[in-house]
Amino acid sequence: MSITAERKAALIKEYATVEGDTGSPEVQVAILTERINNLTDHFKDHKKDNHSRRGLLTMVSSRRSLLDYLKKKDEGRYSKLIGSLGIRR
């Protein structure tokens, strides 16, 4: 259900702007997207898990805020990120 440390490190390495960058919006959105995808798979088997569904909605909202910030600051980075992650917008 959660992402492994190896997968998280791979996401950080792939989306980091500089070496060791874990706080950029791209990295945060990539990690949130991975967690959201894992939870949506979880809900296919556990339809009544409303406690986790609330966490999913919180993650989606947080990702949306980060994407809005990135779009406001640099639209080129924003469009590149949603293209590589496969997020529709």
Curated annotation (Swiss-Prot):
Gene Ontology annotations for the cellular component aspect, listed alphabetically: cytosolic small ribosomal subunit
Q: Name one GO molecular function term.
A: structural constituent of ribosome
KW Isomerase (keyword) present: no
Identify the keywords attached in UniProt to this record, alphabetized. Ribonucleoprotein, Ribosomal protein, RNA-binding, rRNA-binding
Q: What's a BP term from Gene Ontology annotated to this protein?
A: translation
Function of this protein? Answer: One of the primary rRNA binding proteins, it binds directly to 16S rRNA where it helps nucleate assembly of the platform of the 30S subunit by binding and bridging several RNA helices of the 16S rRNA. Forms an intersubunit bridge (bridge B4) with the 23S rRNA of the 50S subunit in the ribosome.
Oligomeric state and partners? Part of the 30S ribosomal subunit. Forms a bridge to the 50S subunit in the 70S ribosome, contacting the 23S rRNA.
Q: What name does this protein carry?
A: Small ribosomal subunit protein uS15
Q: Which organism is it from?
A: Rhizobium rhizogenes (strain K84 / ATCC BAA-868)
Name of the coding gene: rpsO
